Amino acid sequence: MIQQMQMPEKLEVDEASYSNYYGKFIAQPLERGYGVTIGNAIRRVLLSSLPGTAITGIKIEGVLHEFSTIDGVKEDVPDIVLNLKQIRFRSISKRNAVVTLVLRGPKDFVAGDIVSPEGDFEVLNPEHHIATLNEDATLKIDVSVGRGRGYMPAEDNKPETMPIGYISVDSIFTPIRNVKYSVENTRVGQRTDYEKLSLEVETDGSIAPDEAVSMAGKIINDHVRLFSLFSPTQEEEVEEEVQQEDEEFENMRKLLMTRIEDLELSVRSHNCLRSAEIDTLGQLVSKREDELLGYKNFGKKSLAELKELLESKNLSFGMEVTKYRLNQ
């Protein structure tokens, strides 16, 4: 008899250390080898596949390329771009936005100066330094903020129509700062070779750690679930279902191709259908009751007779029959 696999009983959260930025999660007991398998999969998905918000590009008035300097600004453009990449956002509207800023010195340009008039996002590190302007400096800058997953290099971040002076930025969309996992042995009964998985998740505060883990688990589950559809039993069931549907289709097609003259109908009903140029059962069921009553000499008695006939064959008036290709 095959022993049933040991499944983890629950996912525990270390409440003492939990915050909006950090969470430690423990799953046990796991079969040997599953700690690394699950831990590594969740770690990779957390770092690469969760959605987030980041700056995707900028345009600075008077600057034509990313290697320029700006009069009255201490930092050059590469330094400004580097500082902008480190700003963390929480998306509110889940849509892209462009913010235009006009800054005059003397001033310390910080992340908190980037405010969406429409309330599309919130800056999570508003004190983060971007640039220093002296008393003569004026800086006009358009900041594009967008949504994405994981990491997007600048060359893949370029819009289809890029205005002169637009500078694409490497975008770090992922809300995950770091993920670590460790695997230890744990006891179940007399056996000590089961595993305990400890997963530590650090976020930028735009998403709670437990929400991030839940999202990663769903992404993995959605992918892995597809592979469970190909068991031999399910394949046989699907094949039988398809064969049954094909059989039903052909039986219905043959029934609808039945000639009216082969049906047991009164002479009056036969004559009415012949004068209406209705030759097959398929042509009959495609008609509505009011259409039939509009034909010459077609009365309610004939309609009642035909309705009873159709019901005996599990048919009805007004059916859609084009899919049965009755003209072929």
From Swiss-Prot:
Swiss-Prot/TrEMBL keywords: DNA-directed RNA polymerase, Nucleotidyltransferase, Transcription, Transferase
Chain spans, region Alpha C-terminal domain (alpha-CTD): 252-328
Gene Ontology MF terms in the entry: DNA binding; DNA-directed RNA polymerase activity; protein dimerization activity
Region: Alpha N-terminal domain (alpha-NTD), residue numbers: 1-231
Function description: DNA-dependent RNA polymerase catalyzes the transcription of DNA into RNA using the four ribonucleoside triphosphates as substrates.
HAMAP family: RNApol_bact_RpoA (MF_00059)
This protein's name: DNA-directed RNA polymerase subunit alpha
